[in-house]
Amino acid sequence: MAFLARPLLFAIDAETAHGLTIDLLAAWGMIGTPLAARPPSLPVTVAGLTFPNPLGLAAGADKDGRAIAGFFGLGFGAVEIGTLTPLPQAGNPRPRLFRLVPDRAVINRMGFNNGGLAAALPRAQAAKRTGMLGINVGANKDAADRIADYEHGVAAAAPIADYVTINISSPNTPGLRDLQHGPALTDLLARAAAARGTTPLFLKVAPDQEPAQIDEIARAAIHAGIDALIVGNTTISRPSLSSPNAGESGGLSGAPLATLAAQRLRDFRTATGGALPLVAVGGIDSGAEAYARIRAGASLVQLYTGLVYGGPALPGRIIRELDVLMRRDGFARIEDAIGTI
């Protein structure tokens, strides 16, 4: 069915196709049965939470938490919804989502379009969970005090989420990445940490970082008591691309991001000295790529664009491949493979 659906979905506008996919997953989540088995070798504990497996859905796929159960049914060990802002916002003008099919990539300039925290949180609270639920929060584009928006989002999401992610990595909200350095970063992390209560707090940062910025983020996150770093998001860089849409503005995700994302994972592993769990995201579309990131230091991995090209069977395939690869290398548990190269 997935191979039949893809040509139909690829024949229409990317954002319309995404909306239809969310509708289908939302419906299937209410009646469907899980597609993927959960090998007993794959649980991973991060920040006191035991994830059934290390594979998570990255934020951006289910912005408003409409298909949480459906995504869990595909086999994900974690589903991260959002980015959610305190107030609803429309985001940037359409078209704003572009497939780069020859490159197995996507460019987006969505701009934190979402229905707001108040609409999404009741759905998140009611959703059936078979793994860890992350809620990714951000600031409204026109907020007078963006740090206050994060503070509000963390406080609102913390009682419902298994973990909350502060997203300061998006390139599509002007000035947002300025929160990744200097006094603004220190203030943001301190206020967010005070607002989260006992709920684990993750920080999502961009892959477009210089060495000094990486060191600064690592020090600030450790000092503030952040529980994990998600490295990273889409990139504003443009490696060699062959698609007609390659010149569109926005953040690039998918296969061309893999090299940069893997390097940033190694950079943050060095900068944190192993003091913080790392979540790898960017260009992960196979069990081999997920396993390579885990061996390079990631406790968890996430994907989104991989689903666009790999379809709904991809999470289950990655889970099976992880189990095979770790056993091939003599590991009894996937946790034993973390950071072994």
List each model region and its residues.
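Alpha/beta catalytic cores of nucleotide-metabolism and tRNA/nucleoside-modifying enzymes
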Residues: 1-35, 96-122, 252-277, 285-341
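Glycine/Thr-rich beta-alpha phosphate-binding loop at enzyme active sites
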Residues: 22, 26-29, 33-37, 170-184, ...
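N-terminal capping/small domains of soluble enzymes
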Residues: 1-133, 141
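Short beta-strand/loop segments at the ligand-binding rim of alpha/beta enzyme cores
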Residues: 49-56, 129-137, 195-209, 268-280
